[in-house]
Curated annotation (Swiss-Prot):
It is a single-pass membrane protein. May be involved in the folding of the extracellular lipase during its passage through the periplasm. This is Lipase chaperone. Belongs to the lipase chaperone family. It is found in: Cell inner membrane. GO terms for cellular component: plasma membrane. GO terms for molecular function: unfolded protein binding. Keywords: Cell inner membrane, Cell membrane, Chaperone, Lipid degradation, Lipid metabolism, Membrane, Transmembrane, Transmembrane helix. GO terms for biological process: lipid catabolic process; protein folding. It holds the Pfam family Lipase_chap. The chain crosses the membrane at residues 14-34. Its main location: membrane.
Amino acid sequence: MTARGGRAPLARRAMVYGVVGLAAIAGVAMWSGASWHRGTGAASDSPDAPVAGGLAAAPPQAAVPASAGLPPSLAGSSAPRLPLDAGGHLAKSRAVRDFFDYCLTAQSDLSAAALDAFVVREIAAQLDGTVAQVEALDVWHRYRAYLDALAKLRDAGAVDKSDLGALQLALDQRASIAYRTLGDWSQPFFGAEQWRQRYDLARLKITRDPTLTDAQKAERLAALEQQMPADERAAQKRIDKQRAAIDQIAQLQKSGATPDAMRAQLTQTLGPEAAARVAQMQQDDASWQSRYTDYAAQRAQIESAGLSPQDRDAQITALRQRVFTKPGEAVRAASLDRGAGSAR
């Protein structure tokens, strides 16, 4: 992950879950969906609302209050509901991935072991003592295996978007990994997303074909769009809107917009709650960057003091613990330190 003081770029984190479009296979995490409602159990509707497809959701009384020890990046939010089928088993639904992606939003705050423990707690909060709890834990381990396999790809699977052959290979490779690690969960987790990515790639192949005239390209694009199911067309419109919002956030950051200015402009695009969350992220990023810069200066003084490696490392660790007191901050700072060390 590229870091600005140890966090993913703001435009990436502004959308809470769901990797979408060709940006996913290019290694850019564009989080789709609305921001999580503070104090609710869903991204949009009431936590008691039925899950799509007539599936039941875990009993609402099992939900953990939003204030119950959430990582900083999820403060004031609640996890999505885990869907159940009529027999009480975990339903094979994209909503299960949404739950895990929500939890993964906290990975910059937590070590791998702490993230696992957090997911276990969040699952238990909804499904404790049920067969669905065991099933959800199994799917989590499968999903982690999928993500670990992606991370082991060359450049974490990132490819040159101008190379259509490489994009096609990346899509096929990710689909293979998903099926190998997730089994029959690969379709509910990634089926619709993979369809959209292949659709986007087909569009690119048409628009970049030098043998076609503009009229021929328009004709083929129109024919391709007609192949898209109505629900996919609606989903594509949402994705386009989300991409536009991400671009807007990036432009506002590039222009040096203040949190208040960013909030005012994004309110018109994302709504007041999402805009407020993005503005808060910007403030958090600025605060973190300032503290890490001060810490790095003090660390450099220790490194230049001529201490033995053991004493030097002990003093840097103590400094890190003094400066970064919130959960996960010291781990993130240590990770940045290692990155800075390898760069040197």
